[in-house]
Regions:
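Amphipathic alpha-helical coiled-coil segments
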Residues: 112-113
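Interdomain hinge/lid region at the active-site interface
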Residues: 39-109
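Internal alpha-helical scaffold of NAD(P)-dependent oxidoreductase catalytic cores
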Residues: 1-54
Length: 113
């Protein structure tokens, strides 16, 4: 366990990005997939389970967390929307180098954890 001293504002910004946003993404992905053909769940593998594990958190607790840090959570969502739009744009415009660069940057960050 690492202990880091931060200001309250910096704490809120950090946890909005590294805790709250991942939960929102996992929950949103599950909500999206819940609207698909139910038999798709039978085909789900470890990747989907790994990606969505945190969506199993208590919705009432997460409602409180998200509302308590609303301003920073909204900023994190806005930032992520930009990333998703960039990836979509590269795919849509068939910009292979940009798509690879986007995926490589994600891999490098993940590998650094």
């Amino acid at each position: 366990m690492r202990v880091v001293t931060t200001s309250p504002g910096e704490h809120d910004e950090i946890v909005a990005h590294i805790s709250h946003l991942p939960h929102i993404l996992a929950s949103s992905l599950c909500g999206y997939l819940a609207g698909m053909d139910a038999k798709w769940k039978n085909l789900a593998g470890g990747g989907l389970r790994d990606t969505t594990r945190i969506a199993a958190g208590d919705p009432r607790l997460w409602k409180q967390i998200l509302e308590q840090n609303r301003e920073e959570v909204l900023k994190a969502i806005d930032g992520f929307e930009g990333e998703l739009k960039a990836l979509k744009g590269a795919l849509l415009d068939k910009k292979t180098p940009e798509l690879i660069a986007h995926l490589e940057r994600g891999k490098q960050f993940r590998d650094s954890l």
